[in-house]
Amino acid sequence: MSVLEKNITRGGEFIIKETDCNNVFTPEDFNEEQLMMKQAVHDFIEKEVLPHRERFENKDYKLTEEIMKKAGDLGFLSVAVPTEYGGMGMGFVSTMLVCETISGACGSLSTAFGAHTGIGTMPIVLYGNKEQNEKYVPKLASGEMFGSYCLTEPTAGSDANSGKTKAVLSEDGKHYKITGQKMWISNAGFAKLFIVFARIEDDKNITGFIVPNEADNGITLGEEEKKLGIHSSSTRQVFFNETKVPVENMLSERGNGFKIAMNSLNVGRIKLAVACLDAMKRVNSHAIQYANERTQFKTKIIDFEAIKEKLAQMATETYVGESATYRAAKDIEDRIKIRHESGNSFQEAELKGVEEFVIECSILKVAVSEDMQNIADEGIQIFGGMGFSAETPMEGAWRDSRIGRIYEGTNEINRMLSVGMLIKKAMKGHLDIITPATNVGKELMEIPSFEVPDLTELFSQEKLIIKNLKKVFLMLAGAGIQKYGDKLEEHQQMLLNVSDVLIEVYMAESALLRTEKNVKRFGEEKQKNQIRMTKLYLYQAVDIIQSKAKQVIISSSEGDEQRGLLMGLKRFTKYYEFPNTIELKNKIAETLKSENKYCF
């Protein structure tokens, strides 16, 4: 076992193991090459995107296509593509960093970029054969052609495998004829290549096809959809009427389409999270700057505690989201590297590396998309009446952020998926949660210790709380499995509450690990606000976990069992020294005021 493999946590393992802060990646660990790439993308956005904000809001689809072509000329579309197919072949973390930086200024461009570089290109990169990759991927990487992903249908949304689009083999066996209707297809208006999912005969699972958008081949487009947000992202229905597709354009193998679709979503989920981060930072900065300028009652509104509270909360959610997203991104990159070194092909290593962290990807998608919307909403509130005006950046940010909770599987689906996949891993023997869950059960039967632990060392209380919050999850999961067995997935409200416990543990621990690592590296004084944000978020996470766990316990138990579980919850969410959250928020806000921007 390599040193790397020994030190990194496996997917989902965070809930049963303690992680050393030295073994996590933080944004402060970006290397020189990554920072140069980030700056290049930032400069591109400042020059090519920000001056045209009004055009993007006015449904200028041509502008989006033009900007995408320019991004292709600069190589930004090819970061994740192997060098043999015209790409940069950069790692997973670098791919996420480019995605973050290019996505924050404009939701329309974020959608177009994500749809093309992700689900419009990577299914061929990861599932296509050599000939398919050589034929299509260099053109996708350069921006010579743009890709689009045709999965959703009028009757097949979350239930993606229920699509009715048909693929019928021609009599001469040389083509499939695809007939059906796809909807909500991003980039459809300018895509020259479609990844299309259709069912062959009465197959249980759908099949993927690479379908060039050629004239006179039975492909027609609906009108541009009228959407709440992302106004200049092309979104249309795509109709196929006996569209001829050469048999050699089948992607992977027959019946493998559902697997392709699900694995594409895994990558899409963490990419959606990272795409929100720069937008969150920008909204933070806009709100801070406005609050520093706006005067009411002869006082700058940033000096009112009601505004300080909002700004501190917005900054905290941004810091935590960034901490968790890049933690997971590096874990995925490391797992891909380990698989490469053990002899896996590029495709196998990439697919298995991401698939292992499907739980974390779902967690991030939910947490960061909801924080993004909350931050945009509070940004409007800080702007007051001006925030409701399309003349300010807040109105567009709020509308664009709403789609995040729907993309890549709704947040409800992802919540249930995170817990379901964790339990499935346990049942398959890939993750031992049975032993720690059993140990938690034994601990509940013992008389609790009333000894106050030594809390003099920085984060000693926070580490203890994180450790105990993991026990809360194990307690709830164990009780749920014991009562409902394999029918647990039918109890969706219970799963949604349990998943919120899982989410808060991962997010809070990620912030703690980042801050602890950077305190060791830069010193406590330079990390004082990060320490405050970490403590603030954890305290709020405990509040959420107490509420969610109580609902689960009350709904799934009664009598002595219920009383025992509630006592266990009280024990595992105990604070010895309560943080002064009002003071923490005021001090965080004072730094934001002096820096006049998001600065963490």
Give the location of each predicted region:
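Amphipathic, small/basic residue-rich leader segments at the start of a protein or domain
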Residues: M1-G114, E131-K135, K139-F146, S158, ...
